[in-house]
Amino acid sequence: VQGDRDVNVAAFAIHSRLHAARPDVNAAAHSHSIYGRTFSTLGKLLDPISQDACAFYENQGIYKDFSGVVEEVDEGDEIAKALGDKQVAILQNHGILTTGPSVDIALWFYMSMERCCQAQLMAEAAGEPISVSHETAIKTREFIANDIAAWASYQPAFDKIVKMQPDLLD
């Protein structure tokens, strides 16, 4: 890292401890997106109510001890602990965090998780969603949530971003 700009203390507290705890994680995506943030207030895991949501079945943790802006690395340690060996953490009253062996994969899971949070919020507003069976959720997750599928699914979004911002990679 070069330069003399300010460091985002909260980002450092979370990401530095996550990477220390999980050497297999090369990238982590976290933001305060509207649907992830809204879903996080429910204090529960995403249900396997659709094919896309099955990607996160038994692959998410939840951090329930939100205490405001993360300023201490100790809280980053607790977030990493809540994530465990999973790919996604729901940070209650805060948002979502996804991980991966590459930026592409972490971002694809973030984008997909955001849409799945939106879908579950809509489904719950309409009634009582019906989850798929445990067996179906696992089979579907194994098919759609592997690194190759995630990487390939992200490429059209990456191409669109580069087309919209051609100097991005300069």
Predicted segments with their positions:
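Short HxH-centered metal-ligating active-site micro-motif
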Residues: V1-R37, V73-D85
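Low-complexity, flexible helical/coil segments
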Residues: G3-F12, A28, I62-V70, E124-E135
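Short coil/turn connectors at secondary-structure junctions
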Residues: R22-N26, Q51-D52, Y57-Q60, G84-Q87, ...
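Class I SAM-dependent methyltransferase SAM-binding "motif I" and its flanking Rossmann-like core
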Residues: S31-E71, E75
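A contiguous binding-surface segment within folded domains or other stable secondary-structure elements
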Residues: G61-L97
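A conserved C-terminal secondary-structure "cap"
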Residues: D85-D170
